[in-house]
C-alpha cells in the first residue's frame, strides 16, 4: 500500500491488485487516517466486482459519519451498480474534485 498526503486528503493506493487485502490493511490502520479525507485508489485491481466494492461500504459509511469524505477510484467499474452512498470515480482528478465539493458543502452546512 502506498500512502500520499496532499493537504487535507490522504491517498491510499492498492499496490497488490487485491481489493480484499487492501480493505483489510486500510481497516487495520484506519485510526491513522480517520481525521483526513480519504481517496482509496483501486485502479490496480482489474477485476473489481460489485461485491468487492460493496465490501468498502461499512468503511465509507463510518468515515462519512465523521464528516470526512471517502472516494474510491475504480476506472473499470460500472458506476450504475454502486449504491448512492458510495462515491466511486474513474480518476484521481475526479476524486479530488468530489472532495473539494464535499468540503464546500460541509462549510456551508449541508
Model-predicted regions and their roles:
Residues 94-110:
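A charged, well-structured terminal subsegment
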Residues 12-14, 38-43, 72-73:
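Conserved beta-strand segments of the P-loop GTPase G domain that flank and frequently precede/overlap
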Residues 23, 27-53:
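Short, glycine-/small-residue-enriched flexible loop/hinge segments at domain edges that mediate gating
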Residues 54-58:
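Alpha-helical scaffolding segments of alpha/beta enzyme cores, especially the outer helices
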Residues 4-6, 31-35, 63-65:
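Flexible, charged surface loops at secondary-structure boundaries
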Residues 60-82:
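Short aromatic-glycine-(Arg/Gly/Cys) micro-motifs in beta-strand/loop hairpins
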Residues 87-93:
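Short acidic-hydrophobic, aromatic-tinged amphipathic segments that line or gate anion-handling sites
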Residues 1-28, 44:
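STAS-typified acidic loop motif
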Amino acid at each position: 500500500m502506498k500512502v500520499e498526503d496532499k493537504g487535507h486528503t490522504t491517498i491510499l493506493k492498492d499496490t497488490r491488485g487485491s481489493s480484499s487485502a487492501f480493505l483489510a490493511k486500510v481497516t487495520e490502520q484506519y485510526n491513522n487516517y480517520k481525521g483526513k479525507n480519504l481517496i482509496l485508489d483501486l485502479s490496480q485491481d482489474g477485476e473489481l466486482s460489485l461485491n468487492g466494492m460493496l465490501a468498502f461500504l461499512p468503511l465509507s459509511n463510518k468515515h462519512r459519519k465523521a464528516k470526512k469524505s471517502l472516494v474510491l477510484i475504480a476506472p473499470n467499474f460500472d458506476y450504475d451498480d454502486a449504491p448512492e452512498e458510495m462515491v466511486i470515480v474513474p480518476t484521481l482528478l475526479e476524486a479530488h474534485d468530489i472532495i473539494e465539493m464535499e468540503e464546500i458543502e460541509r462549510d456551508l452546512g449541508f
